[in-house]
């Protein structure tokens, strides 16, 4: 996690989660293009490359169902706050065996703490009255699609 995030600086308006294990490939390119477009519109954005983050697997221990938060103190912890503070989240993943990447599945599993806080404890850990946007971008390994995105960007 970036040291600025630990210092309590303002959360980005848009969180971009790159779920690819491959550095500087299609998902990274798309994440950077999306970030540039949103910043041109005046939105603050931050890309999180989850394969560079320390995120433990959910063990289904039930801790979050008793407390409303996860027992692990890892790089997921600041993301929970950013999910609450942000205007939206964009998730980008390669298609692995007709699904999302393994580490992205871990991130999804770890959002169980948010679910449990609302539906088990009736004490939502995020402000449910706040409108947010969400987007998922599935990325296949076709190089001409990247070229098309570059052309559309002009």
Give the residues covered by each predicted segment.
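N-terminal beta1-alpha1-beta2 submodule of the flavodoxin-like/Rossmannoid cofactor-binding fold
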Residues: 1-116, 121-124
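Short, glycine-/small-residue-rich phosphate/pyrophosphate-handling segment
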Residues: 118-154
């Amino acid at each position: 996690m970036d040291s600025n995030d630990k210092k309590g600086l303002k959360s980005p308006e848009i969180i971009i989660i790159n779920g690819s294990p491959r550095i500087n490939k299609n998902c990274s390119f798309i994440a950077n293009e999306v970030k540039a477009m949103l910043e041109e519109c005046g939105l603050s954005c931050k890309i999180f490359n989850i394969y560079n983050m320390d995120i433990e697997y959910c063990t289904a221990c039930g801790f979050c169902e008793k407390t409303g938060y996860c027992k692990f103190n890892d790089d997921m912890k600041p993301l929970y706050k950013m999910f609450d503070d942000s205007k939206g989240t964009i998730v980008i993943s390669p298609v692995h065996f007709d699904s999302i990447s393994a580490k992205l599945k871990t991130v999804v599993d770890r959002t169980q703490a948010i679910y449990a806080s609302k539906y088990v404890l009736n004490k939502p850990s995020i402000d449910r009255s706040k409108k947010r946007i969400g987007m998922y971008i599935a990325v296949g390994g076709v190089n001409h699609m990247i070229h098309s995105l570059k052309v559309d960007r002009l």
